[in-house]
Amino acid sequence: MDLSVVIPLYNESESIDELNTSINNILNNSGLDYELIYVDDGSVDSSWGKIKDICKNQNKLSAYRFLKNYGKSMALSAGFKKSKGEIVITMDADLQDDPNEILALYKMINEDDKHIVSGWKKKRYDSIIFKNIPSKLFNWAARKASGIKLNDFNCGIKAYKSSVIKQIELTDGMHRYIPVLAKNAGFNRISEKIVQHHPRKYGKTKYGADRFIKGFLDLLTLSFVQRFGKRPMHFFGLFLSLIHI
């Protein structure tokens, strides 16, 4: 199979039909052998009912459901494990990611022989104070900590070689750092593509101050593992030295 599109979602019932129609209209004319994988992360609205309805008559669709909300990392991990495509593309279900980017990402990761191509929402339609500025700070810190020159680590739309996502293990909150986990596993051909971003059409954002803080805490954890993972006693030696001083 050429392509798997993995779509994690939580309470996005209003956007599912429109998103599904748009993706299939694009991919049906592409000549690619593809599949769409929806992962409902414990939605409490009618999302799961909508997904079941669209899956009834479409053999390219599959869907999986968590009975409670485990977070985006776990939803992506479940979708990755079920994916069969040589290329795996992820995107959010809120219609802010543009399905027209799918084929461009697919072409870029193949022709440029990349392990990962990450989307970059260079022009964003989000709150400047509550999302744009925190996002810039977060991405600056992630670049410094990881050495990976990406401008939008948290962008939902990304393309991966299947060998990458089958190799790494996602834990809670680490979906933001898949490029870092991939680099640590030896997959270092990572690039980015400027992608179209749309204003949220339905519902409200699920990103808040708590997620921003958690993202930084996860980055600290990842930085610790990167620096001391193979020699953790070096950290404790440094820590004890500081205490002694």
Residue ranges of model-derived segments:
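Short beta-strand/loop segment that forms part of the nucleotide-sugar
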Residues: L32-S43, Y64-R65
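Acceptor/aglycone-binding surface of glycosyltransferases and processive sugar-polymer synthases
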Residues: K60-K82, I87, P99-Y177, L181, ...
